[in-house]
Amino acid sequence: MNKVLVFDMDGTIADFYGVDGWLDCLMAEDTRPYTTARPFYDMWAMMEVLNELKNDGWRVVVTTWLAKNATKEFDKAVRQAKLEWLEKFGFPYDELHMVKYGTTKANCTRKLGGYQILIDDNTKVRNGWTLGTTFDANKNVYEFLKNLRFGG
């Protein structure tokens, strides 16, 4: 059976909302929140546990929304900035989906089948998840993954 961890990006692995003036930046189509956000966790530790889970057969998917009401040019810039963020911090993933704001995230990973866990900070998104279970990213994601790894 496929086992899939589906991560949101903004507010889950990247502290996007911790960037001063993030909303004003987005309204001005400025990618700074995407380029300056810090990781929520020690990425070395996160990479280690995710790579161990991948060795145990889990797939890691990042499914993230683009900015709300953005132009095509800004969407393109956001895609590039998010990709560079993931590369800069070495977040290990098997698939990456950057989709229009509000897209049902389950539609991005449904084809993978199996047991899927969505890790997201948005309650509405978690409540709409239909492919398995969810974990609230406002809690300690790293501890959750360690427990998943060691069956705790």
Give a label for each model feature.
Residues 1, 54-55, 109-114:
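Flexible, charged surface loops at secondary-structure boundaries
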Residues 4-6, 10-88, 93-95:
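Alpha-helical substrate-recognition element adjacent to the catalytic core
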Residues 10, 66, 102, 122-123:
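Short, flexible active-site-adjacent loop segments at beta-strand->alpha-helix junctions, enriched
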Residues 14-17, 68-73, 104-108, 125-128, ...:
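Short catalytic/ligand-binding loop motif for oxyanion handling, primarily in non-cytosolic enzymes
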Residues 48-52, 107-111, 128-131:
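A short acidic, amphipathic alpha-helical/loop segment
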Residues 63, 98-101, 137:
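Conserved beta-strand termini and adjacent loop/short-helix elements that scaffold enzyme active sites
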Residues 93-115:
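Donor nucleotide-activated moiety binding/catalytic core segment of transferases
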Residues 114-152:
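Acidic, Mg2+-coordinating phosphoryl-transfer loop and its flanking beta/alpha structural elements
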